[in-house]
């Protein structure tokens, strides 16, 4: 029954060929034989053959003036590589065809290319898409279709847009399937996407074979698959994938145009199984000619679906007809081969004399065809646009395009200016329905539900448990792991683009003691005992040779911790230190200056400053120095002296307060300095030093030159403190080496006793450990960056470090972990303005006094007048009034003399005014 259907179908095509060809034949035109090698009786090749004849009919009906007419000769390849080669040899040898259209598959094309090259007959294929055909480098082969590798950039753009880090190619085991892999692998490597596995489906795979392969894929963590195979095989694969649960939410399937362009040949069940997948589809631009052709096709062949291969066959035929017309009709013969010799059938085909000329014209033909612009570049068409579709229900929906210049865009007319600002996938593509009718973007990688959890090893620490602490719940007997490193890791897992199941396992012996140091723990990952290590593990070069580290999640190094000693010296002359020598001398000078100035202004009018010479000298010194501590007994009566004394009182107030504050600071403050300043001084002295047990620091110290006898290990902060307090003379150490994260914890506990003076060794920090090649490394590193840039990192740091640093600053960010208040010695520069004010007031007061004195003593002995009492001064009258009020026993006498005193005072004032008004 099946054979009879094929027979009648072939018979129909034969009569249609004859009908269409006869319409294009005119008497007097040169008939040129061309061959078509195709799988006669199959749907897609039959569509292409019909399009070939429609192309010839349309071409010659619109160009009746052309002198050539192509005559199509069909060779049935019988869906076989050898059959295709046999058909081609028969067409060349018996029909002497000048060119061959076809064959259908890439495997068949390999042989035909060799035959065409041997006989100089151009082979124009409209369906062989394998990139491997290009490697044959035959000038007589033309690909009137798109090479499969041309779409890898669109696939790469999609994977990069969604941030998937691993993909698994699923392809057919033949030339067509394998051809795309080299370019696809290179493109994915450009964006750091791994291919952990390649799923190769045999050409004649059974349902059982496909199920076994799909189960392998299901048990892998990767959830992104790229399918490149024939549409018929893809239908079977997706039906099985849906049955096995690989079309649920979380999976991503991307189909190449090899599947999408042949989608119409798949039955409805197969299409429904593909719901949610993404596809790369050949973009056919809309045109009036294309719409007209589609209408004609539906009228003539309503039962047959037009596809892109038919359009390419139509354009390839048009191009060949144009090229043959341009090549002319001269020398269309084949050169004969000497058949007398023992030659093979392939060698006996002869050489086409028309081939070289036709080769040139085919290479230069250019026109706008039904499938778009037609022009050969290096023997093949060059695509610039691919359409991105999303399978929904029993159909497909366009969600965007990929263009060579702009990448992924929603619309082709999108302006390039706006493309540069796009940042998220909804800006590039339309809404997508993923497998399982999911609307959220799949993460692309997850631990299989039937797979095991990650076994994560954690170090068992004795001291510094703020970073990692392992305890056992006495009620449930379960292990409890806490600490800064653990909390940071859990925050990183929350920031991952997919779910990761894990379980912590302490690296300890059955008795609870540590099972080894960090090197031993890291080595367990290399041996496969642990899937990862989380803790205070330092990134080192020797460790990275057998494991992979993530980016550091915490800065680290090696700090040198030394004791502090107070270097402030307190002696019997400490009271002089608050003020500089210059300030002491300046103050002393001003004491004498103020005392002498006040005596000068007061001794002629104030009895307190008169008397014998020795009495007046002692009064000067007494008055000058007594102003510093208490009010002097001597009264100050003149305006100039009072102004000077008030100013000097203010200066003394400021000076004494500053002196008191500086002296108090000097007597109570500490100037703490380290006992040792560098590692080189330790080596030079041969001092004993301490180091953290189970850390890499021991190896660093041995490399530096410290003898083993001078190295003392410790586990806890308390042990380190005890060793440093003892000192090297009492069985302790002179200094200790700790990692900088532990330095923060140690100095937070002993901030006023020790100091970090140097970081002699630089390392890359703390990182999480994974096996070499683990796909988790890149994603965990990106998640570390996300957490480090978020408020969560500050929150974790405050939770585990600030509680010990509340009374002490951060010893890492602040180089001086024990800042002290050092007394500052005061100098003249701090008070020069005050001294200047006193000096100016003094000069003004003395200047006025001198002027008045000289004015009143004109022509007299100045020195005698200077020593005499000024009886004419108004101060004398004021002094008498004050004295009379202060003597109660003379109250009657004072009362009787009131009128006389008032009269005398007024008379003196009037006399002074008449003498010099300014002297009041």
From Swiss-Prot:
Predominant cellular place of this UniProt entry's protein: membrane
Any Gene Ontology biological process: calcium-mediated signaling
Tissue: Expressed predominantly in roots.
Glycosylation sites: 53, 204, 267, 331, 342, 477, 542, 702
Chain segments annotated as transmembrane: 581-601, 611-631, 636-656, 831-851
Extracellular side: 25-580, 657-830
InterPro entries referenced in this protein's UniProt entry, alphabetically: ANF_lig-bd_rcpt, GABAb_receptor_plant_PBP1, Glu/Gly-bd, Ionotropic_Glu_rcpt, Iontro_rcpt_C, Iontropic_Glu_rcpt_pln, Peripla_BP_I
Pfam families listed in its UniProt record: ANF_receptor, Lig_chan, Lig_chan-Glu_bd
Keywords linked to the UniProt accession: Glycoprotein, Ion channel, Ion transport, Ligand-gated ion channel, Membrane, Receptor, Signal, Transmembrane, Transmembrane helix, Transport
Function noted in UniProt: Glutamate-gated receptor that probably acts as a non-selective cation channel. May be involved in light-signal transduction and calcium homeostasis via the regulation of calcium influx into cells.
Record text on subunit structure and interactions: May form heteromers.
Name of the protein: Glutamate receptor 2.2
Organism: Arabidopsis thaliana
């Amino acid at each position: 029954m099946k054979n009879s259907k094929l027979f009648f179908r072939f018979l129909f095509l034969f009569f249609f060929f004859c009908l269409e060809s006869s319409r294009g034949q005119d008497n007097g035109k040169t008939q040129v034989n061309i061959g078509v090698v195709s799988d006669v009786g199959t749907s897609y090749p039959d569509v292409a053959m019909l399009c070939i004849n429609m192309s010839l009919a349309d071409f010659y009906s619109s160009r009746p003036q052309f002198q050539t007419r192509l005559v199509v000769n069909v060779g049935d390849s019988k869906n076989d590589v050898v059959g295709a080669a046999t058909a081609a040899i028969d067409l060349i040898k018996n029909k002497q065809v000048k060119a061959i259209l076809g064959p259908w598959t890439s495997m068949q094309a390999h042989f035909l290319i060799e035959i065409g090259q041997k006989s100089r007959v151009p082979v124009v294929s409209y369906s062989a898409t394998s990139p491997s055909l290009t490697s044959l480098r035959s000038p007589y082969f033309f690909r009137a279709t798109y090479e499969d590798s041309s779409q890898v950039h669109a696939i790469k753009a999609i994977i990069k847009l969604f941030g998937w880090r691993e993909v698994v190619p699923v392809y057919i085991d033949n030339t067509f399937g394998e051809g795309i892999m080299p370019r696809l692998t290179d493109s994915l490597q450009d964006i750091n996407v791994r291919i952990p596995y390649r799923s190769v489906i045999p050409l004649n795979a059974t349902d059982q074979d496909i199920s076994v392969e799909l189960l392998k894929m299901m048990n892998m963590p990767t959830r992104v698959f790229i399918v490149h195979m024939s549409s018929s095989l893809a239908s079977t694969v997706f039906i099985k994938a849906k049955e096995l649960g690989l079309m649920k939410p979380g999976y991503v399937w991307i189909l190449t145009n090899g599947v999408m362009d042949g989608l119409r040949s798949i039955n409805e069940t197969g299409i429904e199984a593909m719901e949610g997948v993404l596809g790369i589809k050949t973009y056919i631009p809309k045109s009036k000619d294309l719409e007209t052709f589609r209408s004609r096709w539906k009228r003539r062949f309503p039962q047959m679906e037009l596809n892109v291969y038919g359009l390419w066959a139509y354009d390839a035929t048009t191009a060949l007809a144009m090229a043959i017309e341009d090549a002319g009709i001269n020398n269309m013969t084949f050169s004969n081969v000497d058949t007398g010799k023992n030659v093979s059938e392939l060698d006996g085909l002869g050489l086409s004399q028309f081939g070289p000329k036709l080769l040139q014209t085919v290479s230069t033909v250019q026109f706008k065809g039904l499938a778009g612009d037609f022009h050969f570049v290096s023997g093949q068409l060059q695509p610039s646009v691919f359409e991105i579709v999303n399978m929904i229900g029993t159909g497909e929906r366009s969600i965007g395009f990929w263009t060579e210049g702009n990448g992924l865009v929603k619309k082709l007319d999108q302006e390039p200016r706006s493309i540069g600002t796009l940042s998220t996938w909804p800006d590039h593509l339309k809404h997508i329905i993923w497998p399982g009718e999911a609307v959220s973007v799949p993460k692309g990688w997850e631990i299989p539900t039937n797979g095991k959890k990650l076994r994560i090893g954690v170090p068992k620490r004795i001291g510094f448990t703020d970073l990692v602490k392992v305890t056992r719940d006495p009620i449930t007997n379960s292990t409890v792991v806490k600490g800064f490193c653990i909390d940071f890791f859990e925050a990183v897992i929350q920031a991952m683009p997919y779910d990761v199941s894990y379980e912590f396992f302490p690296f300890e012996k059955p008795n609870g003691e540590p099972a080894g140091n960090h090197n031993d723990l890291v080595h367990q990952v290399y041996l496969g005992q642990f899937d990862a290590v989380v803790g205070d593990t330092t990134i080192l070069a020797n460790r990275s040779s057998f494991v992979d580290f993530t980016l550091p999640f915490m800065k680290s190094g090696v700090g040198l911790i030394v004791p502090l000693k107070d270097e402030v010296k307190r002696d019997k002359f400490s009271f002089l230190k608050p003020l500089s020598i210059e300030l002491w001398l300046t103050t002393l000078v001003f004491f004498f200056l103020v005392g002498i100035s006040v005596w000068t202004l007061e001794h002629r009018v104030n009895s307190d400053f008169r008397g014998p010479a020795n009495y007046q000298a002692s009064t000067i010194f007494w008055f000058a120095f007594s102003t510093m501590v208490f009010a002097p007994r001597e009264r100050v009566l003149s305006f100039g002296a009072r102004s000077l004394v008030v100013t000097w009182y203010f200066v003394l107030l400021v000076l004494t307060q500053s002196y008191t504050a500086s002296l108090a600071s000097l007597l109570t403050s500490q100037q703490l300095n380290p006992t040792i300043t560098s590692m080189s001084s330790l080596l030079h002295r041969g001092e004993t030093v301490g180091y953290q047990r189970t850390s890499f620091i021991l190896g660093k110290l041995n490399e530096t030159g410290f003898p083993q006898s001078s190295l003392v290990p410790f586990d806890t902060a308390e042990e380190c403190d005890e060793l440093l307090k003892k000192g090297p003379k009492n069985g302790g150490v002179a200094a200790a080496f700790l990692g900088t994260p532990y330095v923060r914890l140690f100095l937070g506990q002993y901030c006023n006793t020790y100091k970090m003076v140097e970081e002699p060794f630089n390392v890359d920090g703390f990182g999480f450990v994974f096996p070499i090649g683990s796909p988790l490394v890149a994603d965990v590193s990106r998640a570390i960056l996300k957490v480090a840039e978020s408020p969560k990192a500050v929150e974790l740091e405050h939770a585990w470090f600030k509680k010990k640093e509340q009374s002490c600053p951060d010893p890492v960010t602040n180089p001086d972990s024990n800042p002290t208040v050092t007394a500052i010695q005061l100098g003249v520069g701090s008070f020069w303005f005050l001294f200047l004010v006193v000096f100016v007031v003094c000069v003004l007061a003395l200047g006025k006094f001198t002027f008045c004195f000289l004015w009143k003593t004109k022509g007299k002995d100045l020195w005698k007048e200077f020593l005499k009492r000024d009886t004419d001064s108004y101060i004398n009258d004021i002094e008498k009034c004050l004295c009379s009020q202060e003597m109660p026993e003379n109250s009657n006498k004072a009362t009787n003399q009131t009128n006389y005193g008032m009269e005398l005072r007024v008379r003196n004032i009037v006399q002074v005014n008449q003498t010099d008004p300014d002297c009041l």
